[in-house]
Amino acid sequence: MSQKSSLLETSIEKIVSGSIAEEVGMEIGDRVLAVNDQEIEDALDFQYKLSLFPNSLTIKLLKSSGELWNVDIEKEEEEDLGLELESIQTRICDNNCIFCFVHQLPRGKQVRRTLRIKDEDFRFSFLYGHYLTLTNLSEKDFQRIFEQRLSPLYVSVHATDPKLRKYLLQNTKPDNLLKNMDRLIKNGIKLHTQIVLIPEINDGLNLERSIQQLLQFYPKVITLSIIPVGLTDHRQGLPKLKSVDAQYAQKTIHHVSKIQREIKQSHGTPFCFLGDEFYILAGEKIPPRSHYGDFPLVENGVGMVRNFIDDFHKELVQPREEPIIPIQGTIVTGRIFFPILKKYINEMNKTLKIDLRCIAVDNHYFGKGINVAGLLTGQDIFTTSKEQLYGDFLVVPSESMTGSQNLFLDNWTCSDLEKHLGVPVWGGGFQVSEFFKSILLKIHSKNSVHVI
């Protein structure tokens, strides 16, 4: 990391009024260089170093004026300094994976900035569960991971066969995946792993080999997620890949289920878990709650549907008064989740005496191969809703928006949809309980805009 980047990551972004930081003269824009002579790299490193010295510490500051300060602080262990550093600067991935989503973005269209970032950052892996390939870790990175016990980490494997993995990643540098994983594990780091499954490339015997080689690291390798490849309509100049269809999904479920049963018999856990999309595409039942353990992979699309179904049933049986004001509205989602959401919206209608209609939005922005709700655009939602809008309001997936303005990835907002459709529009929340509240609170605020 460059000196400039490191300095940016240690700049103070926020000072809490009345805090220790304010009392000792720290200011926004000051740069934290060291804690007790130990150099600081970023916000995560800063928090770790503070934990080493809970009572007495000296912070070396580079003031905005250019002065160097050494600030001595005595505090109680539970006392917070009351400052925040700048966000961690993302390390960029130098792989060129044949299925990389960033390479498949539509050219010449508005795209949310974060979608254009190819991150490969062990800090984001630890903090947010982002997957990394381990191809850009330096010796310094390894030592920091060991020292700070940054565990678990999330590793994109895709294939354990070196030649196949090299082809998938399109990276000419030496890889040593299994050796690096072994090193992490021997130093106390636990791992979650994933394979993005591509028909006729890393499936079949290659998939079996990957599963068995990763299983050798269990329980230090906690899980393996198997996720279907996502292909947009914008793959000009990229390798030709086959998408996952219903027939392939059925075949994969049959193949992996057999392996899961064998592993569960020998290890007490299925170990490898298929993404929900496989079951939906194949028209198969979602596995029971017991299949997923404590649901460690929901953010990777594994067990999310089972969570939704179970939570929906819990909410549905909660005692509620019948609405005084008729509730009529439209709920939109992506094509893949539509049959499930529609089924449970119908149950909600019957039980709560309300009138909601669920509609599926096709993704014209990325193409029909991308069918998840989180990647819907405002324009596509409008195009579908203007023809099928029912009732007094529209509820859209919260995961398709970001920020206080509720911005879709094509820079449309909820306000834009309201303007064009003539009805209130809001997000349905990230939990089933939030979804129920966002609907039922309309009883008391039918003509207001209520964003969850």
Predicted regions and their residues:
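Structural preference for beta-strand elements that scaffold enzyme active sites
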Residues: P152-Y154, K190-H192, T223-S225, F271-F273, ...
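PDZ-domain C-terminal substructure recognizer with occasional recognition of PDZ-binding tails
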Residues: Q47-E84
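Conserved Radical SAM active-site core
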Residues: E67-L68, K75-K220, G230-I259
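Conserved PDZ fold ligand-binding element
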Residues: E23-E41
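Radical SAM enzyme core and accessory elements
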Residues: M1-L7, S11-I12, G283-I452
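Flexible glycine/acidic-rich beta-alpha junction loops that bind and position SAM and/or redox cofactors
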Residues: E200-I201, V221-Q247, S266-S290, N363-K368, ...
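Terminal peptide-recognition signature
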Residues: A21, G29-V32, F46, I59, ...
